[in-house]
Amino acid sequence: MSLSVTRENFDEWMVPVYVPAPLIPVRGEGSRLWDQQGKEYIDFAGGIAVNALGHAHPALREALNEQANRFWHTGNGYTNEPALRLAKKLIDATFAERVFFCNSGAEANEAALKLARKYAHDRVGNHKSGIVAFKNAFHGRTLFTVSAGGQPTYSQDFAPLPPDIRHAAYNDLNSASALIDDNTCAVIVEPVQGEGGVIPATKAFLQGLRELCDRHQALLIFDEVQTGVGRTGKLYAYMHYGVTPDILTTAKALGGGFPIGAMLTTQDYASVMTPGTHGTTYGGNPLATAVAGKVLDIINTPEMQNGVRQRHDAFIERLNTLNVRFGMFSEIRGLGLLLGCVLQTEFAGKAKLIAQEAAKAGVMVLIAGGDVVRFAPALNVSDEEIATGLDRFALACERLQTGGASCG
């Protein structure tokens, strides 16, 4: 007999680095989840932009089960067929010539930053070690990546932090230009700042960063952990901008819910990462890469990417209609199915409260700071699920506006 568990057990048994919602999901199908009490939710959170094809997608289950019946793990002393096939698919679909597999976005960004430092040290000298990142960015929770992220709340308790990391203002080329020089080895940037408020970069900003990196022989790293694998209506967001990075990191949606990350780069840059310079026990394991290969097969199609753009329009239209009714948002922004609703001044700081009320109404949404409600639904979310979910979201907005909302 299995152990009966409740939300209270989390507080008893788990390290308290999270504050999970009161509900515990137990089953999912498509863009719907059900909790222990059988209550249904429309999922517009997508596991924070992870569940790109929803829950329990039959093709992903089949790919996982097929590989699970063969073998699970060998370690990095051996390669495997699913990893090689996935690497080739990523290379064929992007600028990349070499791929490094890991287990998460933080690990992918860690690998990218290490590569950039090593390339600069090997080709120029140890003095070329500076990294320029951006305020309010998020690149992961390792000591290196949390230092690159421009949110002191996440890093201030872990000093001393890795040195030679400076932060410019996002979408401000003058601010970046003041920091990038001949001692800079890398610039790391999100094409859309996700945790920082769902803020798309301007084309001029990314083009300017590309030019600055070329001028100072610095590597341009695009963190596409949240924007990658179809989320913006193209396979990767850099394809919207006509700006090609030197290194790209990807994770989240790549596995459709199964943990995987990857760093993509060119042969020249990859060449400095010789045997023993970096590694991972589980990265590129056959279970993860088999599932990710199927995810790419489904998402990297014109039909799916056109569908994302159509669903973007449907969300924007309905959210604008909702905003006419409630007047809660000063701006609705984003790319594809990564959307942010910025709260008006009178509702400032209440994004979490709206998310809590939304869950009570039967729809899951995210926040991006205290003032932005974030949506990252499955890329194949249906018209009916969009309509039902946003009707439920409207109930949450109504409760907040009329003063009926309460914490907890």
Curated annotation (Swiss-Prot):
A molecular function GO annotation: pyridoxal phosphate binding
Pathway participation: Amino-acid degradation; L-arginine degradation via AST pathway; L-glutamate and succinate from L-arginine: step 3/5
Keyword annotations of the record: Aminotransferase, Arginine metabolism, Pyridoxal phosphate, Transferase
InterPro entries found in the cross-reference section: Ac/SucOrn_transaminase_bac (IPR017652), AcOrn/SuccOrn_fam (IPR004636), Aminotrans_3 (IPR005814), Aminotrans_3_PPA_site (IPR049704), Class-III_PLP-dep_AT (IPR050103), PyrdxlP-dep_Trfase (IPR015424), PyrdxlP-dep_Trfase_major (IPR015421), PyrdxlP-dep_Trfase_small (IPR015422)
Recorded superkingdom: Bacteria
Transmembrane spans: none
Disulfide bonds: none
Pfam families cross-referenced by the UniProt entry: Aminotran_3
N6-(pyridoxal phosphate)lysine modified-residue sites: K252
Cofactor: pyridoxal 5'-phosphate
GO biological process, one term: arginine catabolic process to glutamate
Classification via CDD domains: OAT_like (cd00610)
Reactions catalysed: N(2)-succinyl-L-ornithine + 2-oxoglutarate = N-succinyl-L-glutamate 5-semialdehyde + L-glutamate
EC number: 2.6.1.81
Record flagged with keyword Transferase: yes
Enzyme class, first EC level, given as a word: transferase
Function description: Catalyzes the transamination of N(2)-succinylornithine and alpha-ketoglutarate into N(2)-succinylglutamate semialdehyde and glutamate. Can also act as an acetylornithine aminotransferase.
Family: Belongs to the class-III pyridoxal-phosphate-dependent aminotransferase family. AstC subfamily.
The protein's name: Succinylornithine transaminase
Gene it is expressed from: astC
